[in-house]
Amino acid sequence: MAAHLSYGRVNLNVLREAVRRELREFLDKCAGSKAIVWDEYLTGPFGLIAQYSLLKEHEVEKMFTLKGSRLPAADVKNIIFLVRPRLELMDIIAENVLSEDRRGPTRDFHILFVPRRSLLCEQRLKDLGVLGSFIHREEYSLDLIPFDGDLLSMESEGAFKECYLEGDQTSLYHAAKGLMTLQALYGTIPQIFGKGECARQVANMMVRMKREFTGSQNSVFPVFDNLLLLDRNVDLLTPLASQLTYEGLIDEIYGIQNSYVKLPPEKFAPKKQGGGSGGKDLPTEAKKLQLNSAEELYAEIRDKNFNAVGSVLSKKAKIISAAFEERHNAKTVGEIKQFVSQLPHMQAARGSLANHTSIAELIKDVTTSEDFFDKLTVEQEFMSGIDTDKVNSYIEDCIAQKHPLIKVLRLVCLQSVCNSGLKQKVLDYYRREILQTYGYEHILTLNNLEKAGLLKAQTGGRNNYPTIRKTLRLWMDDVNEQNPTDISYVYSGYAPLSVRLAQLLSRPGWRSIEEVLRILPGPHFEERQPLPTGLQKKRQPGENRVTLVFFLGGVTFAEIAALRFLSQLEDGGTEYVIATTKLMNGNSWIEALMEKPF
């Protein structure tokens, strides 16, 4: 059992066990020794559900990455392809199967589509002449993956682009399916609130799916009180700004994939006697660390503003140092025994402290640089409404010095969003400069950003952002980063719009912000799901509500930190569980919208 998944009000181990059981059942259908051929993208998410030990218990002897031509030799009875339903992957699978058939003794082939079977893919396999080779063709509905005790993600990398650019609702269907699975395990969610076009569609799909399952009455006592469905395009601003929490900065600088981060190895080299680390013994392979709340220290610092992390680390260092000094005071056998029993925990704490001190040093090298400061200053000026309507000299300099294109696009999009679109001549100027400097092939990327609403010309000459900013208190001048009193600490002044909507829904309710809700894109709505008699929830005095916030189109670690902050408020009244189509940051978001024609 993954202990860190069961610490919150909602025990997410129940979900993890359900998906593990489904996987075990499929593996047992394929009797005998097995090799799994993985769609490489799935190995990370699967690692959070089932370690190799579980697969081994069910006779999985070999694992390969899906690649063209022949499969590596493996003396096994079954070959299982575990893949997303993508047409290009079907071509590779067909190549693998045909080359195996020519190789000699027959194997049993099976295919497991994640998260859904696809008629198009099966037709492609048929056209390639291999569909009949598969004994089992099934689907594994891994819609929502538990990442932490309050965090679920579909890890659907193309969800935002599919929904907002291509009009493809597949990921919305998977989101609705995932929510139905949650309700089967944790009870019907009595109230659904939503904002945005995609939110409306997911709610409609859920109602339709519920009608189809009318025969099976859900008799599970509800754990969640509310579901809030939020479209990413209701708040395009937040992911574009630089996250300033510890976890957010790790993701911005190094990228967190499936709760793992890869870091420069030299910072983690063991120190040699006499200080310094040995030159020729320096490790060359990236240091890979898992980041979740199973690690006590990480759970404590992950959601803090980075400026508050240093003092926590130095306090921890003193406590650990004092604990190790205790060994000199251990005189009796009993005292020595007690010290020895605590040693493994103390050594783990010391290792954890060393790792996070190194990570904090790496981050500090970036955050104390002149360029980081200049970029942050410009971002904060835009978010507080300063000089958003004219060409920005810092952005001009970045283009002239050919800074990474993603950085430039993030800033231009941020300026556009904070001005409800750019004046036509400002937009034309940026567009011309970007294409001349970075290449005309990027016209496709700029078109995508315009389609998504991230970059646009101001229509009607009206800037709605100041109204939204004031009504929702999105900019706070005096932020206490050490002991925050408001969610704006996660961006050192800017309160994420998405999280402010969740906060206001909880108290005093959205009626207080009707005017702003009408300005923001998409409908807002409320649905009630009737509960069977006897399952109505009677809350105890002082017991908090539990709200599931589902971000359709992606969520950042800073937004997650802000929701956790609200959960921990003594008089907050609501605890939050977060679900999303994808964990993302501004860079990965813009990158997913970039076209690579060559």
UniProtKB/Swiss-Prot annotation:
It is found in: Cytoplasmic vesicle; Late endosome membrane; Lysosome membrane; Early endosome. The keyword Protein transport applies. Gene3D superfamilies: 1.25.40.850, 3.40.50.1910, 3.40.50.2060. Pfam families: Sec1. SUPFAM superfamilies: Sec1/munc18-like (SM) proteins. It comes from the Eukaryota. Its main location: cytoplasm. The keyword Membrane applies. One of its GO terms (biological process) is protein transport. Keywords: Autophagy, Cytoplasmic vesicle, Endosome, Lysosome, Membrane, Protein transport, Transport. Changing residue 251 to E: Detected in mice with the buff mutation; leads to melanocytes with a reduced number of undermelanized melanosomes. One of its GO terms (cellular component) is autophagosome. It is a peripheral membrane protein. It is linked to Defects in Vps33a are the cause of the buff mutant which exhibits hypopigmentation in the coat and eyes, due to reduced size and number of melanosomes in their cells. In addition, mice are prone to prolonged bleeding, due to a platelet-storage pool defect. Core component of at least two putative endosomal tethering complexes, the homotypic fusion and vacuole protein sorting (HOPS) complex and the class C core vacuole/endosome tethering (CORVET) complex. Their common core is composed of the class C Vps proteins VPS11, VPS16, VPS18 and VPS33A, which in HOPS further associates with VPS39 and VPS41 and in CORVET with VPS8 and TGFBRAP1. Interacts with RAB5C. Interacts with UVRAG, STX17, MON1A and MON1B. Associates with adaptor protein complex 3 (AP-3) and clathrin. Interacts with PLEKHM1. Plays a role in vesicle-mediated protein trafficking to lysosomal compartments including the endocytic membrane transport and autophagic pathways. Believed to act as a core component of the putative HOPS and CORVET endosomal tethering complexes which are proposed to be involved in the Rab5-to-Rab7 endosome conversion probably implicating MON1A/B, and via binding SNAREs and SNARE complexes to mediate tethering and docking events during SNARE-mediated membrane fusion. Belongs to the STXBP/unc-18/SEC1 family. This is Vacuolar protein sorting-associated protein 33A. It comes from Mus musculus (Mouse).
